[in-house]
Amino acid sequence: MPEGTCYKLSPSELTFLYNSCKHCFVLKVRHGISQPSIPLPGIFSTIANLQKDYFADKRTEDFLPELPSGKVEYGEKRIKSDVISFSDFPATCYIQGRFDVVLSLDDGTWLVGDFKTGRSAPEKTEMYGRQLHAYAYSLENNAGDFLSLGPVTRLGLIYYTPADCDMNENIFNLKGGLEWNEVPLDMENFQGFLKDVLTLLEGPLPNPSEDCNWCNFRALTQNVEGASKGLPEIPTCPDCGGAMAKRNGKNGSFWGCRAYPKCYGTLNI
């Protein structure tokens, strides 16, 4: 790997893809090879959007008293961190994504939250915590003109669990309660996790996971007569000689240097 590679990390990939399959995670982040996308049922997006509209500017005591005193300040905004580096490690990274909700607390600090639909799952707190820490880090260490907030002192998940329904004047109502699951804030541990991620990305490609459906699919198709073997060839950057990743732009797909934004080399596909 060329020295100085700068990886783009999304909060969702650090949470779900990293947790489910290291092989697919490295393929995505290092090589730009994504798992085939499967659209989520639209109802979840509808519920999330309705929640964000309803909670906008509301005081916490008016909808979930377990929350610290404050009000909903921001809903769904894009974030991007400054470049993250470690003194004893050549590779760097940055975080880019979109948070669900941020609350301004009465003590002058900020709370970063995420809406979930379904029963609360305390056993997944650590996994979801990566996503929330990624948002918090990016807000406190923003790049350029992206949103800057701090200090972030609280993180957590707001669960909506449907439990009952009724009909009133031809309007069908789905009812349920809200539950607050706080995530312990530990930015030092999160930065250590990011260094582990960079170590993984700079190392050899992990073996396919036995419990990953996409890894199993690739293995099965490679056994079909006439199937091509191995990963597609990754070109080298015409400007710096480093590896490239497949990216999507307004005019379609192209090869972009993985050292971006330090290098702007591109190739047509």
Model-derived segments and spans:
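Metal-dependent nuclease catalytic regions and adjoining charged, substrate-binding loops involved
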Residues: 1-13, 142-234
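Metal-dependent nuclease catalytic cores that hydrolyze phosphodiester bonds in DNA/RNA
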Residues: 1-105, 109, 119
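Cys/His-rich zinc-coordinating "finger/knuckle" motifs
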Residues: 28, 219-222, 244-247, 264
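Acidic/negatively charged segments and metal-coordination signatures
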Residues: 232-233, 237-245
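Short linker/helix segments within small regulatory modules
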Residues: 247-256
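Short metal-binding segments enriched for Cys and/or His
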Residues: 261-269
